[in-house]
């Protein structure tokens, strides 16, 4: 798959409910963000955040990752263009904001991107690889080779998605794969 960040390898696990996997492009780390400002921008109290500094990570789409204490806080979070401006301070490049709470299976997540015209995305594969890197960095999931977990996203907006993550090599040094399956809602043929 040719993306703006370059070629992204894809594989399909065949079967009655096939999973489609993508290999996350190289992840870069950026600046950190103040927890109190992030909480205000998201309409939350700073006590709703885990004691982990929010950080910008990117595998093509710059995204601020904010770890919250529980799924209730994730469901109460909201980010509009005003909140995004508050969070960004003087940063000019557009960015997404990914909030999540660790769960026994991995993470319960939401992604907001008002600067891209997306109030909320139900399934963000391009941010789920960096989510894995963030969670490994702060010990929220194991960084051991072969680690697998899921990120549940889109539930609050009524479009529940399950994204599967597979860590290759210690701390993902050989890659982070993100996969899922789809429910076809339309089909078309294009003649050129």
How would you label these PLM feature ranges?
Residues 1-192:
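Active-site proximal loop and beta-alpha junction motif in alpha/beta enzyme cores
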């Amino acid at each position: 798959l040719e993306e703006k960040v370059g070629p992204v390898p894809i594989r399909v696990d065949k079967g009655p409910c096939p999973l489609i996997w993508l290999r996350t492009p190289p992840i870069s780390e950026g600046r950190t963000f103040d927890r109190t400002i992030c909480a205000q921008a998201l309409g939350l109290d700073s006590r709703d955040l885990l004691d982990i500094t929010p950080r910008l990570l990117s595998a093509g789409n710059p995204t601020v990752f904010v770890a919250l204490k529980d799924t209730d806080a994730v469901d109460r979070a909201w980010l509009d263009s005003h909140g995004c401006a508050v969070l960004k301070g003087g940063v000019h490049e557009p960015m997404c904001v990914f909030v999540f709470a660790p769960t026994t299976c991995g993470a319960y997540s939401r992604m907001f991107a008002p600067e891209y015209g997306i109030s909320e995305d139900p399934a963000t594969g391009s941010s789920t690889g960096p989510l894995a890197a963030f969670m490994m960095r702060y010990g929220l999931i194991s960084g051991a080779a072969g680690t697998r977990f899921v990120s549940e996203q889109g539930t609050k907006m009524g479009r529940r998605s399950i994204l599967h993550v597979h860590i290759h090599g210690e701390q993902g040094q050989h890659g982070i794969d993100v996969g899922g399956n789809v429910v076809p809602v339309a089909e078309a043929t294009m003649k050129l």
